[in-house]
Amino acid sequence: MPTIIEITDLSDPALDVFARLTENQLRSRLEPEKGVFIAESPKVIERALDAGAVPFALLMERRKIDGPARGILARCGGAPVYTADREVLAQLTGYTLTRGVLAAFHRPALPPVEALCQNARRVAVLENIVDSTNIGA
């Protein structure tokens, strides 16, 4: 079971990854091996875990710990879980966590281009994408 840490100080630097870093800082364009991504719901966290990503911190509503997120916690090893009531988390992040759970993961190494294209029938090359979540929207 991970270590559960009650949030008592919103300025704690350990919470920066969830509240004070920009997308560009999380991606760490100049040092991609240090890049981070945030999974923003139990379903997305489960997918990341299934793909082999390892979380280094979680942010979670207190009521989720013994409820819907119990299965996620069992898979997260020693990653610290920062927790508080919904209102405190909204104050920290600037928005209400709709599913009550966030997880911070280190970005995995990218596979070689040859491996990605090996069985592909089509390949799209997109340059200068700032926010990949908008692709296809």
Q: Where are the predicted features?
A:
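Boundary-proximal intrinsically disordered activation/regulatory segments immediately upstream
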Residues: 1-68
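A glycine-rich helix N-cap at a beta->alpha junction
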Residues: 73-94
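A general structural signal for well-ordered alpha-helical segments in protein cores
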Residues: 14-18, 45, 89, 98, ...
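Short coil/turn connectors at secondary-structure junctions
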Residues: 54, 78-79, 99, 119-122
